[in-house]
Swiss-Prot record:
One of its GO terms (cellular component) is vacuolar proton-transporting V-type ATPase, V0 domain. This is V-type proton ATPase 116 kDa subunit a 4. It comes from Mus musculus (Mouse). Specifically expressed in kidney, but not in the heart, brain, spleen, lung, liver, muscle, or testis. Distribution within the kidney appears more widespread than that seen in man. High intensity staining at the surface of intercalated cells, with additional expression in the proximal tubule. Residues 1-390, 429-443, 559-576, 663-720, 806-833 are cytoplasmic. The gene is Atp6v0a4. It is found in: Apical cell membrane; Basolateral cell membrane. Residues 681-700 are annotated as: Disordered.
Length: 833
């Protein structure tokens, strides 16, 4: 259980694996996900490592799998097995390569054949429609005989629409062009040929499919009449430029009919072949879809294992692989078991050897988390990963973070909406996780679902404390205030009530205030009071100061546990104790004055209540001459003077003593080292040269343990100044709890007054319809402004209060994160490089 509050104890071990068993052992460790491999080849180029060829083969397989995925996209549904595939053995890579390369080759061949057949189908379809349209043209537009194109121009004028100036033998060109190019094609043809051609075109009713892009295309059929070889060449060049397809079209009607019949027969045969080819392609895709997910997992696992093996060393005999691993000490038994399973799986007889390695390198920091605590741990780690074995703020953040958020966000109505949203994500988390969404914004909210859940719960709690629900109050227990005694004793009468814009209740009059406060939260009568804001400002401001100082004192107390764990006795005496004295004597005393004033003065004596602010300022100035501000209690001057003096004493206590103690310790250790060297020299009979050598070694050792008093003193001075000034600035920083709570309450009230109350005031049928419309607007604005914008603002401020005001009292955050080799992280794409 101690690991919850402090990072896991880590161990660095050297593992000796037989080359044949290394792959299986690493794969078993990847399934376990509790081992971080140390890169022993950091200075070696990635292309010069031992298993680079295997990694390239895996990348080649990944390329094939991406090709298969692209082919299956929008055509075949990829089947996802219930259980992930096991890590394949090294020898299975050859089988997998053969299978995938064969499938890729067959699919590429099928695609090429299918594309070629589709292209032929497109050309034949275009030719079919061209022959039909050409025949229709000759039948409707001309009365020419079969010898029209052979004889001279004696019958030319029988073509009704051909210009009369065209004489001589006529030729024609027929083809197909994309519809969007038709207008430009016609204009260019007219200009280049200077009007000496006759163009006739018609739109194809059938949509065609591009064999390459598979997009639908619209085309026009055209026929151009011309005279002379030069015009024919010009027309051909223009058609080529506009990517128009020219088809041979017989001059005689019988030949055209015969060609059309032949084209129809070829189209029928082609459709049969295309159907068979598509059926074969679909069978290949079905085979790929059934195994694609398993293949991807196998390849990713193999590639990850070889990447890890590239981080290991191979001994000179090429028979043993040496790896260095970080792992939690508590999981040693599981890791040894995984290595033994890998050895058995590989068929090796050599048991992997683990030997602990002594190192001065700081171990990585590993904090165990579950789906509930992971979000809070991420908040802490976003500021900085904790130093090894220092106390972990995350368990305390689970409570303090949503609570401080709720203090700023406090509204039980808004908290209820937030709670319902979080509950929906929590209750449907399995279904939502299975969808594996790639939307970054959604993933941020979903990963923080338990954080949002607690923020909603705490917001409901603080909302009930504030008695605030969508800016309105609940009157569950009945108010503790009554107006009847004001009439009974004659303070109020009908005339006063009718002529006074404001009436003030006097709690000093018996019966006006019952003496028993509202059982839970703020009395609902304050919702009617004109001085509601004044009362709430005072209440929330003092509450913010109390919560802030308590939060900071808790942070300082946590630093004590760090000092005790790391056995820093000097830090306890010369750092923790003066820090606590400084904090408690000044700011702890401020909290005492606030609570004491609340308890000391009631309705009858409140007029004589002194100002805490003036007392606190006078405490630092030693100014007690203000007779208008009565003391809170007897001997207040002596008590406050004592607190200021011990606070001032704690500053040099923190600043001066520790550097000088460290200096004295260093000088003592140097003296002991020098004495040892002197004794060794006296016992040596090697003469003066030996003394010189010993002296040289002594100087060298002293250099290695260099002690810089100036650096230590400057560091301690910075820490002291930062802490003392930080106590003041951090206390002021907690006033954001008051400011944001006030802003949220006022925005909520404005939204209710300017939107929802309008709908509630509407009368008749208009009110019946209008209230639904206005409520929709109110709901949208509430979610957008108060829940999203205000919620994000309160979240960021709570984040700052934890990162700066709380964690800087005890948290170093200078560690490195434990990044274990885990197939789960590899498959999720969250593995760190």
């Amino acid at each position: 259980m101690a690991s919850v509050f402090r990072s896991e104890e880590m161990c660095l071990s050297q593992v000796f694996l037989q080359v044949e068993a290394a792959y299986c052992c690493v794969a078993e460790l990847g399934e376990l996900g509790l081992v971080q491999f140390k890169d022993l080849n950091a200075n070696v180029n990635s292309f010069q490592r031992k298993f680079v060829n295997e990694v390239r083969r895996c990348e080649s397989l990944e390329r094939i799998l991406r090709f298969l995925e692209d082919e299956m996209q929008n055509e075949i549904l990829i089947q996802v097995p219930e259980k992930d595939a096991e890590t394949p053995l090294p020898r299975e890579m050859i089988t997998l390569e053969t299978t995938l390369e064969k499938l890729e080759g067959e699919l590429q061949e099928a695609n090429q054949s299918h594309q070629a057949l589709k292209k032929s189908f497109l050309e034949l379809t275009e030719l079919k429609y061209l022959l039909k349209k050409t025949q229709d043209f000759f039948e409707t537009e001309t009365n020419l005989g079969e010898d029209f194109f052979v004889e001279d121009t004696s019958g030319l004028l029988e073509l009704r629409t051909i210009p009369a100036f065209m004489t001589g033998k006529l030729g024609f060109t027929a083809g197909v062009i994309n519809r969007e190019r038709m207008a430009s094609f016609e204009r260019l043809l007219w200009r280049v040929c200077r009007g000496n051609v006759y163009l006739k075109f018609s739109e194809m009713d059938t949509l065609l499919e591009d064999p390459v892009t598979k997009e639908e295309i619209k085309k026009n059929i055209f026929i151009i009449f011309y005279q002379g070889e030069q015009l024919r060449l010009k027309i051909k060049k223009i058609c080529d430029g506009f990517r128009a397809t020219i088809y041979p079209c017989p001059e005689h009607a019988a030949e055209r009919r015969e060609m059309l019949t032949s084209v129809n027969v070829r189209l029928e045969d082609l459709i049969t072949v295309i159907t068979q080819t598509e059926s074969h392609r679909q069978r290949l895709l079905q085979e790929a879809a059934a195994n694609w997910h398993s293949w991807v997992i196998k390849v990713q696992k193999m590639k990850a294992v070889y990447h890890v093996l590239n981080m290991c060393n191979i001994d000179v005999t090429q028979q043993c692989i040496i790896a260095e691993i970080w792992f939690p000490v508590a999981d040693t038994r599981h890791i040894k078991k995984a290595l033994e399973q890998g050895m058995e799986l590989s068929g090796s007889s050599m048991i992997p050897i683990m030997t602990e390695v002594e190192t001065k390198t700081d171990p990585p920091t590993f904090n165990r988390t579950n789906k509930f605590t992971a979000g809070f741990q991420n908040i802490v780690d976003a500021y900085g990963v904790g130093s090894y074995r220092e106390i972990n703020p995350a368990p305390y953040t689970i409570i303090t973070f949503p609570f401080l958020f709720a203090v700023m966000f406090g509204d039980c109505g808004h908290g209820m909406v937030m709670l319902m949203a979080a509950l929906w994500m929590v209750l449907n988390e399995r279904h939502l996780l299975a969808q594996k969404s790639t939307n970054e914004m959604w993933n941020i909210f979903f990963n923080g679902r338990y954080l949002i859940l607690l923020m909603g719960i705490f917001s409901i709690y603080t909302g009930l404390i504030y008695n605030d629900c969508f800016s309105k109050s609940f009157n569950i227990f009945g108010s503790s205030w009554s107006v009847q005694p004001m009439f009974r004793n004659g303070t109020w009468n009908t005339h006063i009530v009718e002529n006074s814009p404001y009436l003030q209740l006097d709690p000093a009059i018996p019966g006006v205030y019952s003496g028993n406060p509202y059982p839970f939260g703020i009395d609902p009568i304050w919702n009617l009071a004109s001085n509601k804001l004044t009362f709430l400002n005072s209440y929330k401001m003092k509450m913010s100061v109390i919560l802030g100082i308590a939060h900071m004192i808790f942070g300082v107390i946590l630093s004590l546990f760090n000092h005790i764990y790391f056995r820093r006795t000097l830090n306890i005496i010369l750092q923790f104790i003066p820090e606590m004295i400084f904090m408690l004597s000044l700011f702890g005393y401020l909290v005492f004055m606030i609570i004491f004033k609340w308890c000391r003065y009631d309705a009858h004596t409140s007029r004589k209540a002194p100002s805490i602010l003036i007392h606190f300022i006078g405490m630092f100035l030693f100014d007690y001459d203000d007779s208008s501000n009565a003391p809170l209690y007897g001997h207040q001057q002596e008590v406050q003077t004592f607190f200021v003096i011990i606070a001032l004493v704690s500053v040099p206590w923190m600043l001066l003593i520790k550097p000088f103690v460290l200096r004295a310790k260093h000088q003592k250790s140097q003296l002991q080292s020098f004495t040892i060297h002197e004794d060794a020299v006296e016992g040596d009979h090697s003469g003066h040269s030996s003394k010189k050598t010993a002296g040289a070694h002594g100087m060298k050792d002293g250099h290695e343990e260099e002690f810089n008093f100036g650096d230590i003193f400057v560091h301690q001075a910075i820490h002291t100044i930062e802490y003392c000034l930080g106590c003041i600035s951090n206390t002021a920083s907690y006033l954001r709890l008051w400011a944001l709570s006030l802003a949220h309450a006022e925005l909520s009230e404005v939204l209710w007054t300017m939107v929802m109350s309008i709908g509630l005031r509407l009368q008749g049928w208009a009110g019946l319809v209008g209230v639904f419309i206005i409520f929709a607007v109110f709901a949208v604005l509430t979610v957008a402004i108060l829940l999203v914008m205000e919620g994000l603002s309160a979240f960021l401020h709570a984040l700052r209060l934890h990162w700066v005001e709380f964690q800087n009292k005890f948290y170093e955050g200078a560690g490195s994160k434990f990044s274990p080799f885990s197939f789960k992280h590899v498959l999720e794409g969250t593995a760190e490089e």
